[in-house]
């Protein structure tokens, strides 16, 4: 096979990034946007010795699992990778991905996984689920100001104010801002020259409260005719907070370091279950509140709290899981590296009248071992103990030093919430080699139409 060869291929499998996989005489091709069962014509773009990457030129025979994407930009945009696959098959793919990693990397037998894994938790309506969206502003090739999303692996903006994953209110907000910019001849930011005013617009929406936040990220200290823009935006139903964030750095980082209120509050509020959260422009908050409630419900069920337990919640963010757990535990300790998130966590505990949650700023892999060592010094002959430990790390998973301390603290149960089943499998292998057994596994579709999947597992001390 050589570059620019055009081939006919049947798609037999799906890769971890959602790409179709087909074979020609044992030579493997990865083809973006192809679906298992498709017969396609594809042009080879990059040819290695045993495999290559090809671009789909046309679908000769569509798969029975192929659907028409809801969004007309699904193929160009980098936001959704698998919108062309039926939702039932998306769920199948994600479940298989999780269990495959647990078997291949974790070394767990298919028989065990079949016995302990519950079906993936899907969505009733797998669209318009995101409570947060960040829209870049720029110019198209005709010099017209546009907003939308970046095309995959580029910084070219695809003009689209109606994302199928975002809430419908986004469209009215973006069109209001675009027409204001046109009226006052305001320039969007240009990455190449570093000139222009508006860089991004961040929109947050409270699914329960219906409150809206708009944060305008600008390449200046203020917006000319700002009062007019505020007047237009505050007419939109649900508008609660309008802020600006100044970012004058030549960087890909979206937000500036701080923000200033132009109108309304500095935050919006929303609920997960019965817990109320304050969310600022810089807060980390799960983007899919419908599935988050199910995800945390599972974590709580697996923790199996009776009311007298001491619980550690590592990588706790703004205390979302901690506050859920605190309703049913004696004491919860939350650890998070981002100081702003811990401020939010403490504030959220106060708002909800929760007094049995204590939060620490720092790296989980430093705070927990540090606490364990300090406890041993202060209580000779004793060791720090936790009844339950909950972890929800980033994609890189947990460092071994942290896993080691977790094992030393001898919790009866460990609940691991993961956004990367490969690092989850690696960490479970360590824990199950050091006195724990895998009891339950369940995937949760937190990011429909994309390849990402969350997993919740329960480990029990042998």
Per-segment meaning from a language model:
Residues 157-199, 220-246:
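Internal alpha/beta scaffold segment
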Residues 2-8, 16, 221-462:
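Rossmann-like S-adenosyl-L-methionine
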């Amino acid at each position: 096979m050589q570059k620019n060869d055009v081939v006919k291929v049947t798609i037999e499998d799906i890769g971890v990034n959602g790409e179709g996989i087909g074979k020609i005489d044992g030579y493997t091709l990865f083809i973006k946007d192809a679906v298992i069962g498709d017969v396609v014509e594809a042009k080879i773009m990059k040819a290695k010795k045993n495999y290559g990457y090809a671009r789909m030129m046309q679908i000769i025979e569509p798969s029975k699992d192929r659907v028409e994407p809801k969004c007309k930009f699904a193929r160009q945009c980098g936001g959704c990778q698998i919108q062309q696959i039926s939702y039932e098959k998306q769920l199948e793919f994600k479940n298989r991905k999780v269990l495959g990693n647990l078997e291949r990397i974790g070394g767990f037998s298919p028989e065990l996984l079949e016995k302990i894994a519950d079906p993936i938790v899907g969505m009733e309506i797998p669209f318009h689920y995101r409570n947060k969206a960040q829209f870049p502003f720029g110019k198209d090739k005709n010099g017209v100001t546009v907003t939308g999303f970046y095309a995959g692996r580029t910084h070219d903006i695809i003009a689209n104010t109606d994302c199928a994953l975002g809430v419908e209110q986004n469209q009215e907000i973006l069109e209001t801002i675009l027409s204001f910019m046109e009226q006052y001849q305001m320039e969007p930011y240009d990455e190449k020259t570093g000139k222009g005013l508006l860089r991004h617009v961040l929109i947050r929406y409270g699914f329960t409260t219906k409150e809206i936040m708009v944060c305008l990220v600008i390449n200046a200290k203020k917006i000319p005719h700002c009062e007019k823009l505020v007047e237009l935006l505050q007419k939109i139903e649900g508008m609660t907070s309008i802020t600006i964030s100044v970012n004058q750095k030549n960087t890909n980082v979206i937000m500036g370091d701080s923000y200033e209120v132009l109108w309304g509050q500095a935050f919006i509020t929303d609920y997960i279950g019965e817990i109320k959260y304050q969310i600022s422009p810089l807060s980390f908050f799960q983007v899919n509140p419908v599935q988050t409630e199910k995800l945390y419900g599972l974590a709580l069920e697996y923790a199996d709290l009776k009311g007298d337990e001491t619980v550690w919640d590592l990588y706790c963010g703004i205390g979302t899981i901690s506050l859920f757990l605190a309703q049913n535990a004696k004491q919860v300790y939350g650890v998070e590296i981002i100081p702003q998130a811990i401020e939010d966590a403490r504030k959220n505990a106060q708002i909800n009248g929760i007094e049995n949650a204590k939060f620490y700023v720092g790296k989980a892999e430093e705070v927990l071992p540090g606490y364990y060592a300090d406890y041993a010094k202060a209580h000779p002959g004793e060791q720090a103990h936790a009844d339950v430990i909950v972890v929800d790390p980033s994609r890189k998973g947990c460092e071994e030093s942290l896993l080691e301390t977790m094992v030393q603290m001898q919790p009866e149960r460990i609940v691991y919430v993961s956004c990367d089943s490969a690092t989850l499998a690696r960490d479970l292998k360590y824990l199950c080699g050091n006195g724990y057994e895998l009891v339950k596994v369940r995937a949760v579709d937190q990011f429909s139409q994309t390849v990402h999947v969350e997993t919740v597992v329960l480990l029990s001390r042998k």
